[in-house]
Amino acid sequence: VNSKIPAGARFPEIDLPKVGGGNVKIGGDGRWQMAIVYRGKHCPLCKKYLGGLDALKDKIRDAGIEVVALSADTAEQATDFAAEVGLDVPVGYGLNEAQMKQLGLYISSPRPNETDHDFPEPGLFVINPDGNVQVVDISNAPFARPDIDSLLNGIAFIQAKGYPIRGTAG
């Protein structure tokens, strides 16, 4: 059983290998981050969803937010996915089951011909410069995901107005 990361909680620092070499680090202090967890190379809706990031490049830059994409895929699968989608953001791979559970993600077993490993269902986390979860969205299916353009508008509002982390009462 997974437990959700509460809004306002410290985001666990996760370090994953990155497509193209090096590592991608999620969590920690000092910057705004948006970590988008996708199901994997086998998911056409993930390709469409993350393919929309390119049109939002300027808005992402203006928000001063680092966007990273994460999956449980292998290096080869993640590299192929990033190339097929034309991703211009860091892509971390090799998310393991313990990390998926730590993030409170739903985990699915593959159907025939999907992939060769269990994988996370979609999740999106906005981490503030204090290293805390500002916004969290976790889904159990590929069909329900937040609109990134609207989310970027919300982040700009949060930054400009000092809007508090919501969902922390009770």
Regions found by a protein language model. Name each.
Residues 1-170:
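Chalcogenol-based redox active-site neighborhoods
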